[in-house]
């Protein structure tokens, strides 16, 4: 009877804990932020890896790549303003045109090999042709691979495609955003809501074109929005 009661409690609290999971808040990276504050000689090199498609790669109007205006570099710039003693590497393992099913195949070889202190995953924009289920499975494999190595993860919801009305309820980008939110909550990891950043601009009356370099790539103003979402964790 006692064993049955203990089993019930373990199941109850285990299931309750999973169901009540929340997306990580600004305290998620407290250990990393502590490292970023350290001065020489106590500090160490921090590796941030950005894994995904053409947007983190820096493609603006294809084939032009504007690395210094893309959100990984803009994030680095903001981090250095906030943490002047930190030695930070921004490493982009992203590939233009790639989806998460392709990205997961090279995750260990191209991402984990850098011994990251933090991994960003940004694939949803290119995953639409695969569907939600396959995308979820691929992203989940990458999350688990990172967490198995005690590496924190921040997922990014999709930046816009001009062919999608971001203000329309239930559009395909919103569906992928909701899927990623659920994953982030289930694993209690971070989520930078790029989709919401752009949608808010539209619902406030701004023209989405002002933030885009081409139909599916943000310009520098658009990348600034994405970097803003990331910096909430720092």
Each model region followed by its residue ranges:
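Short, Asp-centered acidic motifs that coordinate Mg2+ and/or phosphate
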Residues: 118
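Bacterial Sec-dependent N-terminal signal peptides
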Residues: 1-22
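Catalytic His-Asp segment of secreted/periplasmic serine-dependent ester chemistry enzymes
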Residues: 159-234
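Solvent-exposed loop/turn segments at secondary-structure junctions
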Residues: 54-57, 95-101, 125-130, 159-163, ...
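Serine-esterase "nucleophile elbow" of acetyl-processing enzymes
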Residues: 21-93, 107-115
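Short, solvent-exposed loop/turn segments at secondary-structure boundaries
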Residues: 60-66, 130-134, 165-171
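Internal alpha/beta domain cores that form substrate/cofactor-binding pockets in large enzymes
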Residues: 47-49, 86-114, 126-156
